[in-house]
Amino acid sequence: MSKVQVGKKVPDFRALLDNEETFKFSENKGKNLVIYFYPKDNTPGCTKEGEDFRDNYNVLKKLNTEVIGVSKDSAASHQKFIAKFNFPFNLISDEDEKVCNLFDVIKEKNMYGRKYMGIERSTFLIDANGKLVKEWRKVRVKGHVAVSYTHLTLPTICSV
């Protein structure tokens, strides 16, 4: 499967959700979708990012937008993460990295001199027709969610 590109339709994909149901991208047509990728459940930055999406969830819903998070954590880990922080949205368990590879977010990282492959914190805005309209890579957690939803007020999104 080819990688997503801004301005192009996102290919249909399926993935395992936290509730062990299957997320089907094709079933989300008709509403905007924010997909955010984060490295790991229950870590400080990832928790803060999830809390920011949670705290802005009602604003996003009013803009006809659904939120979904993605990491390589298991569905069981996601269930605990959601319960602990009261997230009103689902998380995709991408242990096989298929969704991560589709969105090209697996990158070489460096921690304390040790190189490894991991998720680069990234967010993607997909319009109601399934077209990728904006991507943010190497995201800084603070203030990122507000920047994400300001793009939803652009005429190209609101007129869809």
Each model region followed by its residue ranges:
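Conserved small/polar residues in nucleotide/adenosyl-binding loops
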Residues: 43, 150-156
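A short beta-strand-turn-helix
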Residues: 14-32
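Short, internal strand/loop/helix patches
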Residues: 68, 79-120
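Thiol-/selenol-based redox modules, centered on thioredoxin-like
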Residues: 120-152
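N-proximal helix/coil linker or "cap" segments that precede and/or mark the start of modular domains
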Residues: 1-12
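Short loop/turn microsegments at loop-to-beta-strand junctions
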Residues: 10-11, 32-33, 120-122
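Structural microenvironment flanking redox-active thiols in thiol-disulfide oxidoreductases
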Residues: 47-90
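Short active-site neighborhood of thiol/selenol oxidoreductases, capturing the structured segment around
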Residues: 28-44
